[in-house]
């Protein structure tokens, strides 16, 4: 499996964010997208996820499921945690399993993998910032998808949380998955760097 983007151009609010950008990621590979604030790191992830329209170029996922769109084979995890405070930790994850569809994994196992199994009953309103991030990351294993698109995935995570997430990413890559992450900090795993130039 391989993700390819050729000659990508992004325009937002009438302003060209970037143009002529190429991106590649093969099965088992991580790509760290780096650059100044406003350079277009998040925009690139959103283009790949199909959340923004391409102003130029083409994106393809070769070797994926031909009956599914690229978006249906990808997890897009934004920098904000999309959680409902009134729902429990487990209920939030089950909501995402049902919303995303596909083949769900065991929700309790996914919560345990991110260190939240013991508070599955707790309303999300009571979670710390780091725990909220862990719950968001649990979506990645709760529904299996080969491509992970991650925007500042380690934000709010302490050292233990970062090590936990590095293990999740490593397991994903070792199983043939691929990931592209926009980040200002090291991911904690081997990753090829894609630098986007320019500033806001």
From Swiss-Prot:
Its main location: membrane. It is found in: Cell inner membrane. GO terms for molecular function: ABC-type heme transporter activity; ATP binding; ATP hydrolysis activity. Keywords: ATP-binding, Cell inner membrane, Cell membrane, Cytochrome c-type biogenesis, Membrane, Nucleotide-binding, Translocase, Transport. The keyword Plastid does not apply. Residues 1-199 form the ABC transporter domain. SUPFAM superfamilies: P-loop containing nucleoside triphosphate hydrolases. It is an enzyme of class 7 (translocase). SMART domains: AAA. It is a peripheral membrane protein. The keyword Transmembrane does not apply. Its EC number is 7.6.2.5. ATP binds at residues 35-42. One of its GO terms (cellular component) is plasma membrane. GO terms for biological process: cytochrome complex assembly. It catalyses: heme b(in) + ATP + H2O = heme b(out) + ADP + phosphate + H(+). Signal peptide: none annotated. InterPro entries: AAA+_ATPase, ABC_transporter-like_ATP-bd, ABC_transporter-like_CS, ABC_transptr_haem_export_CcmA, P-loop_NTPase. Belongs to the ABC transporter superfamily. CcmA exporter (TC 3.A.1.107) family. The complex is composed of two ATP-binding proteins (CcmA) and two transmembrane proteins (CcmB). Part of the ABC transporter complex CcmAB involved in the biogenesis of c-type cytochromes; once thought to export heme, this seems not to be the case, but its exact role is uncertain. Responsible for energy coupling to the transport system. This is Cytochrome c biogenesis ATP-binding export protein CcmA. It comes from Rhodopseudomonas palustris (strain BisB18). The lineage of its organism: Bacteria, Pseudomonadati, Pseudomonadota, Alphaproteobacteria, Hyphomicrobiales.
